[in-house]
């Protein structure tokens, strides 16, 4: 009594399950990790990527590389996603997190082959993660964020793995000054918003050494009228987000005019309105008016007569930065302007021509809580890479200021945590001890990769590093990424923020757990009709190829 087979899934569906899926996920993760393995450490190689639009990206930043890569496998997509998460959360460690997650999955493969249930492996990984976090906190050391020399050293160890390391001193100074400028403390809570208030302006030309941090704001705008002043000391600044033009009616407004005088009256009302708006501004005797909207020719005429400089169509984000820098308040209506809305914190308003473009500088502010970083360089590609590196440096500085704890770099903290996990696994009983010990083994991938990227002997140096960590008081020993030899990170001054390390470990282990829990992939395919529909269009190419 054999009936017809019951089809539950559509014929266009493809289903993979069990062991095949798990090994597929692990291989995808390992492939992604292998792509950027050479991008770790001070001897990191750079990758050149061509984006779909034909633009070139040259970088060794893990997140920037993976962002440009097109992948199809769902596990590879989730690996790329964790790199982006790491970048948004702490701004650094994007390469480490991918390598570590790939290795965590790689060491789990042998247990799956031995028919160990994924739940057992996951349980061991969770235990190991808790112990890793506690161990990291134990070996971390507090740091005084007001010690400029030490802060520069910390940022330098982050920059050392980047292309910008040739100008490390300048970059460290820029990153530290920018973060200290935008740091705001309210109700005992520190807020450092680099994205909003530390703007990076890239201007091709000049040399990288010309880059600097402005104590104020720079905007790519010129004054609206040639007769307006282009250099003002101690300016009084008014910021608006309304236009100095006659208000057009809302959509499809109609006015019916029966007499000629009515038309003249309408024109007169427009002029009176603009005159009134300008009088509201002139009443406060400002030197500079900056608006996000337009300024009509008539309004410019009144402002020039009152010796007021005007800048129009400034971005909202730039306007917010100017407000923070000079202490002005952005007004939405001119008739509501008060004396306290005028910004008097800026020391200098100046228009400069750099290359072919005009830039407005509002600098020498008394207590700016916003700044602009001006980057100069030979080409757009170099500037883009320098900006990426600088963003990482600022994020590292921000992490240390908010959470002032450090752990040793150069693979020292990984080896230290791995040693403690290995010792703990000896006291465990049952099957879980093997995946638990495998986590310790996976952590060694960071120092191993550092040694490989130097071209040194991996086995010899890693073995001697393991032996070193069994001794008392050698927790800060790691790999000198420049020379590929053992060194004390404390003496070399290579430190990493605790926040970055914690996030790296958590993200890597949780991603490994997530991918190990997958045992089935169902993928929907395009309908057959769609493929047939496209074939006639492709058909004419066949004869050409035959020729």
Curated annotation (Swiss-Prot):
Binding site for ATP: 41, 93-95, 410, 481, 496
Amino acids binding ADP: 41, 93-96, 161-162, 410, 481-482, 496, 501
Transmembrane parts of this sequence: none
GO terms of molecular function: ATP binding; ATP hydrolysis activity; ATP-dependent protein folding chaperone; unfolded protein binding
Leading EC class: hydrolase
GO BP, sorted A to Z: protein folding
Residue spans of biased composition, Low complexity class: 535-547
Biased composition (Basic and acidic residues): 525-534
Catalytic activity: ATP + H2O = ADP + phosphate + H(+)
Disordered: region residues: 525-547
Coiled-coil annotated residue ranges, if any: none
Keywords: ATP-binding, Chaperone, Cytoplasm, Disulfide bond, Hydrolase, Magnesium, Metal-binding, Nucleotide-binding
EC number: 3.6.1.-
Binding-site positions, Mg(2+): 92
Entry GO terms, CC: chaperonin-containing T-complex
SUPFAM superfamilies linked: GroEL apical domain-like (SSF52029), GroEL equatorial domain-like (SSF48592), GroEL-intermediate domain like (SSF54849)
InterPro entries documented for this protein: Chap_CCT_gamma, Chaperone_TCP-1, Chaperonin_TCP-1_CS, Cpn60/GroEL/TCP-1, GroEL-like_apical_dom_sf, GROEL-like_equatorial_sf, TCP-1-like_intermed_sf, TCP-1_chaperonin
PANTHER family per record: CHAPERONIN
Described purpose of this protein according to its UniProt entry: Component of the chaperonin-containing T-complex (TRiC), a molecular chaperone complex that assists the folding of actin, tubulin and other proteins upon ATP hydrolysis.
Family: Belongs to the TCP-1 chaperonin family.
This protein's name: T-complex protein 1 subunit gamma
Species per Swiss-Prot/TrEMBL record: Xenopus laevis
Name of the encoding gene: cct3
